[in-house]
Amino acid sequence: MDLVIRNGRSEHGQPIELGITAGVITAVSSPNTLPPAAQEIDAQGGMISPAFIESHFHLENALLWDGLINQSGTLEEAIEIYAKVKHDLTVEDIVARAGMVVKTAVANGTLWLRSHVDIDHIARLSILRGVAAAREAYRDLIDIQLVAFPQLGLAQNPEAVEMMWQAMENGCDLVGGMPHGEKTMDDAAKHIDIAFEIAQKYDVDIDMHIDETDDPYWHSLELLADKTVETGWQGRVTAGHCCAMSAWDDKMAARIIDKVKAADIHIITNAPINSMLEGRHSGYPKPRGIARVKELLEAGVNVVCGQDDLQNMFYPFGKMDPLEVALITAHLAHLGAPHEIEAAFNMPRYHAARMWGLYNYGVFVGAAANLVILEAETAVQALRQQPANRTVIRNGRVLTERKAETIWHMSN
């Protein structure tokens, strides 16, 4: 064996040790049973978890904060600010900022990242070139997927449609969309139709920003579900945000959730950013624009959580830590029972792996050795304590170790 991890625990608290050979888990054993290896790690009683997955992010505008302050705090102003500066972004700048993000993410235990890339008549393919260069630059640290994201619309923008086709020829892995950015539901339907046409041509999955508003008028999620079933794209479609769901009445929400389940659509909730952006136009009681996470989970829908933005005009905070995102999601979605906390913990892990189609993901013999060791014994502890100490392993190779220490300067 190349690597043995001793004195660890499974995510349910059982003492275990792992053997890894050629980047694959080849043994999951009870303590003190595996032979010596070329390299050994003492997990010190920590949980051996599969590494985290960041499923909804925007690499190109991460860390764009200085001088670009969103005074109103609204999504609309954030989009306006970004539209004014996106044409000035260089490949070198995007790669440099992406590197800071990637290194932070990896040190926190994230080994997969899906980034939406703005494709429009302003930036054309310049941003894609930058993010694609970043993907190549950091390929030894993290797997990055790129989503062609037409934030400024498709239905009335033939140039953007052409750019989307070109984006798929120039490195994008998935087709994105933002149908609620159109002016009417009819145009939203056209937007969705265009996205599916492109996805079917290239036989790729779809990941759209859906109903990122607290206006109950918007229900493009329903259109997306209908189109998914119509085209046979079940299991291959993801809907991010879904904020308007919180403004629908219960009957409407239940009907559309049933359609989402039937279409096997994955839902990504971006609780930190949407709780910051939504409700800005309302008095009290003030909506917070969070998808109905609990109802979706109860219906059997696969729910994932995502960071979305980091220290920019859309969101001034964030640590690129899926544990923080899961904790905030648990708060805002009222996930407080033990099984609900476990569901929140699984959102950037097993739920995300299902969305990505990572079938060799986990801690079992034959799985790829992509792991994070956490100073916690259970899901509840992981979310409560947000442990700083973490060891990150990619394909059987130790990438990072973080060891924080508290020093007491008191006699007792």
Predicted regions, residues:
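Histidine-rich, glycine-flanked metal-binding segment
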Residues: 1-49
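Divalent metal-coordination and catalytic microenvironments
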Residues: 8, 23, 45, 56, ...
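Di-metal (Zn2+ and/or Mg2+/Mn2+) metal-binding site signature of metallo-dependent hydrolases
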Residues: 46-68, 213-214
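Active-site gating loops and adjacent loop-to-helix segments of metal-dependent hydrolytic enzymes
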Residues: 62-94, 171-174, 202, 220-238, ...
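Alpha-helical scaffold segments that flank or form the walls of functional sites
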Residues: 65-116, 122-137, 162-169
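Histidine/acidic residue-rich metal-binding segments in metalloenzymes
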Residues: 126-140, 156-266, 282-305, 361
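His/Asp/Glu-enriched, well-ordered alpha-helical/loop segment
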Residues: 205, 226-237, 273, 277, ...
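C-terminal cap of metal-dependent C-N hydrolases
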Residues: 354, 365-412
